[in-house]
């Protein structure tokens, strides 16, 4: 950060001896009441197909509320809220973490049924996102602001894993607050991937940080945070890791296994859909917050160019529907020159048998991965939902994803929303791809397990596409079991019928995901903080090659 410089640390970073960056001092200005104009809102809410009334100004959040107050969402509705709502709020508040008297995040889980804590007593960046959205929707932005500032401090340090120095823009995967009752001090220890199962840096943390910064700005109307030199620099550092020129011939990001929510070896190395969708959303979010002064103008120009290329690439080469599947089935191979139709030399014989039965005549989705001679046909829920929210998916593609969910409800939702991926890996394929991972056995954990946290992303995607009835159906399933099962981390089985064999109870993002989904359904105007409308000026003209087969 400006004026602070970098500090060399070991494999763990600690705040114990470092004076706090007093970023909040520069932010102690009266919040601006901003009348949202069309240019700020990207597109009027009335243009959404949901049929809900337009939410014109910035969502007004009552000031001076304590984080222990009664949820506003309950008071805003004329009907009696589900009993789970109050209990979910109590559980969420129990997970709050304080640093020197200020709330800075929520623990991954508060499971008192086991003595094995592992790393669930830490604040994970990706895990905190639904908690942050719940607090923002409830008019409690302070915890989100403190979290953004605290993680920004951690980004500013020099980071080393063994003898290797990580990029300056890398955000932590998680951090832990250590309380010393004798000295009455609080210290922070951060993990940048050196303590993770696969020792992989979290690629998604920086993207979620930018997306959350925009959500905070949209929810509160407080531009002073995103416009500080520190936040401006933080965004640029994150993007500098992604926009650097190298040997890439694709606009997508090349990633290792285990760098995102799927944090174990699951065959997603290469160009996973989750990272590409988050990358696209982070680019668009940053574009709305970066100031065009100094080097900001150059960064903005690079973002715009990358967005053009990335949207074209993803919409053409990652998209799969019945027609595209038939085209790939008929592909010729070993094509050379720029006129090649099978640009990645995907072998038709590599198409798995299950996808022919899985693909309906109406519907489609973004496949899990596309690279040289490689196409991962698995469905990944997070990547497809974020593609809708970020408008990486065109309106037609967004509707097709929703059609697929309805057609394949039993497979993708079953008895507990939502399958993180489909189908599972099993047998010889499981042994080769996962390395015989005992946690990722068939229909468990990241290998086809069902994750309640994905409910909020599903609900947001449903509202944006005008299909809230799909979300309500999923919420009904959640309300029939989640509280009774003590808010588990994930469910196992082909239908998601069984609590996961290693699932933590009272998993915070399962709790927060439910709250966000309920509040979105109660007040669909909240969608504005986590949704980006299609940018007509950015939208490229998509044309297929003249040699593309006409079937």
Swiss-Prot record:
Temperature dependence: Optimum temperature is 9 degrees Celsius.
Major localization listed first in the record, in broad terms: cytoplasm
Superkingdom of origin organism: Eukaryota
SUPFAM superfamilies (UniProt xref): Six-hairpin glycosidases (SSF48208)
Nucleotide-binding among keywords: no
GO molecular function: beta-fructofuranosidase activity; endo-alpha-N-acetylgalactosaminidase activity; sucrose alpha-glucosidase activity
Subcellular locations according to the entry: Cytoplasm, Cytosol; Nucleus
Coiled-coil segments on the chain, per record: none
Bias kind Basic and acidic residues: ranges: 53-63
Region (Disordered): 50-74
Post-translational modification: Phosphorylated at Ser-547 by CPK3 and CPK21.
Keywords assigned by UniProt, alphabetized: Acetylation, Carbohydrate metabolism, Cytoplasm, Glycosidase, Hydrolase, Nucleus, Phosphoprotein
Cellular component terms (Gene Ontology): cytosol; membrane; nucleus
Conditions for induction: Induced by mannitol in roots. Induced by hydrogen peroxide. Induced by dark-to-light transition in roots.
One of the protein's GO biological processes: sucrose catabolic process
Phosphothreonine sites (modified residues): 70
Documented EC number(s): 3.2.1.26
Reaction catalysed by this enzyme: Hydrolysis of terminal non-reducing beta-D-fructofuranoside residues in beta-D-fructofuranosides
pH dependence of function: Optimum pH is 7.0-8.0.
Stated family: Belongs to the glycosyl hydrolase 100 family.
Biological function: Cytosolic invertase that specifically cleaves sucrose into glucose and fructose and is involved in the regulation of multiple tissue development including primary root elongation, root hair growth, leaf and silique development, and floral transition. Is involved in osmotic stress-induced inhibition on lateral root growth by controlling the concentration of hexose in cells. May regulate sugar-mediated root development by controlling sucrose catabolism in root cells. Contributes to carbon partitioning and cellulose biosynthesis in seedlings.
Name of this chain's protein: Alkaline/neutral invertase CINV1
Species of provenance: Arabidopsis thaliana (Mouse-ear cress)
